[in-house]
């Protein structure tokens, strides 16, 4: 991943923090305001989809993919995880997560993973425990139910 893409990812997360912390009143009429207002908690779908769109708008060749993970009770017990469902972005072969720190077991505010770090490990463990990871296109208007 290029330094410029990394810079844009970090800048985007900073913009989400700013919007949620000091400008949320300006976003109140936005359809997904409830998600943004709780950032980073419960807004992985919003953050991932909006990041993917932002990256694609800046460079149409990137083609980011949204990955929705769902864990099992066995996974949560075995790994003492608080994750039930989570959404991340894959771009240029890298996993990107702006909200992983919403879960007690993770502290990093931005995770950019070449598949050998925490996100790659998380996906392998979810699959190994019978959970799912579904790839989909960018969906700005939808949210997780």
Where are these regions (language model features)?
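A structural boundary/capping signal
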Residues: 1-145
